[in-house]
Amino acid sequence: MEMPREGDYIAIQSYKHNGTLHRNWRDTMVVKTEQNIIIGVNDRTLITEEDGRKWISREPAIVYFHRKLWFNVIAMLRPDGVAYYANLASPFILDREALKYIDYDLDIKVFPDGEKRLLDADEYAMNKKRWHYSEEIDSILRSTSFELLDWIDQKKGPFARKFVQIWYERYNQLRPDLDRSFFKGRENEERKILGT
């Protein structure tokens, strides 16, 4: 399938190694595409969990996906600053239905103050055993963890300060419903979070 264009909405589907659908984001606006990269924004997006529970995201989030990297990144714009959630996951594929990837359980969360935390190591150990992750996948994910920490420390790619500002501004240029902005009436808060 050809890459979506800026302003298009796509669904994002996260699967587990055994092929089960883990989570679905219904409407993500694409703000940038390159040969191997899709950057999008979720803003009050309907999310459906594997057990059927549905909820709406509370704050805008910029998502970064790469066809060759074994992680994806969510930058969440929160009142106290930008927090990052990096999923160790397969590179994405794209078909008519959605952007899809396999979630490999491990996550690195970066708080607005810069603190980093590895999450779900116990879930990874359990699923590795249950679903027989290969040694190759285990090795890729271990090396990717170090690569990801390096990106975070060097403020590379989606962790660069300007990344959030640039792509959130682009989102606001593309969206037809600007009066629904998360920051409507709170522009000073927006400037503080984005560092503008």
Swiss-Prot record:
GO molecular function, one term: magnesium ion binding
Name of this chain's protein: Nucleoside triphosphate/diphosphate phosphatase
Catalytic activity annotation: a ribonucleoside 5'-triphosphate + H2O = a ribonucleoside 5'-diphosphate + phosphate + H(+); a ribonucleoside 5'-diphosphate + H2O = a ribonucleoside 5'-phosphate + phosphate + H(+)
UniProt organism field: Lactobacillus johnsonii (strain CNCM I-12250 / La1 / NCC 533)
The enzyme's E.C. designation: 3.6.1.15, 3.6.1.6
SUPFAM superfamilies to which the protein is assigned, alphabetical: FomD-like (SSF159234)
Active-site residue numbers: 23 (proton donor)
Residues that hold Mg(2+) 2 according to the record: 105, 107, 120, 123
Family matches, as InterPro entries: DUF402, FomD-like_sf, Ntdp-like, SA1684
Residues the record lists as binding Mg(2+) 1: 87, 103, 107
Family, as annotated: Belongs to the Ntdp family.
PANTHER family: PTHR39159, UPF0374 PROTEIN YGAC
Function per UniProt: Has nucleoside phosphatase activity towards nucleoside triphosphates and nucleoside diphosphates.
Cofactors, names only: Mg(2+)
Gene3D superfamilies for the chain: FomD-like (2.40.380.10)
Pfam family, one: DUF402
